[in-house]
A protein has these predicted regions:
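Active-site microenvironment of metallo-dependent hydrolases
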Residues: 1
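A metal-dependent hydrolase metal-coordination microenvironment
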Residues: 4-129
Length: 129
């Protein structure tokens, strides 16, 4: 025997004033010379900053992002590409200026989403521009 139940569906966003919310330009999947891209780690971050992004996650193959001002940390043996071309990272001054928006006087900062990594790590070719 089939029993019908009555459900009441409520919109959890009914009380949200959408006019007061902002949109954030975000990239959650970015590669650099720390793995299989041809653009240097620090240059990639600056390019996204210059393009007006608010949030950026560096997610290189087999490389953990511990902060844009820290040397990208390879997982030994699994990350081969960055052995060929050594990535550079931001200075502490550049890092602070990008975070708070004073780098090139943009007026708003860009958030560093740390601990990004792409887990398929054994990449031997430069697959990204």
């Amino acid at each position: 025997m089939l029993t019908l139940r009555k459900f009441k569906i409520t919109n959890p966003y009914a009380g949200v004033d959408w006019d007061s919310w902002h949109h954030y330009k975000t990239n959650l999947h970015t590669h650099s010379t720390a793995s299989d891209a041809q653009v240097d780690f620090s240059d990639m971050i600056k390019a996204y900053y210059d393009a007006g992004f608010d949030i950026l996650a560096m997610t290189d193959h087999g490389v953990v992002n511990h902060g844009w001002n820290q040397k990208p940390r390879r997982i030994p043996v699994l990350s081969v590409s960055s052995i060929i071309k050594k990535p550079t990272w931001l200075s502490d001054e550049e890092y602070s200026a990008i975070l708070d928006g004073t780098y090139k006087n943009r007026g708003r900062g860009m958030t560093d989403l740390r601990y990004g990594i792409e887990i398929n790590t054994a990449v031997f070719t430069k697959a990204h521009a």
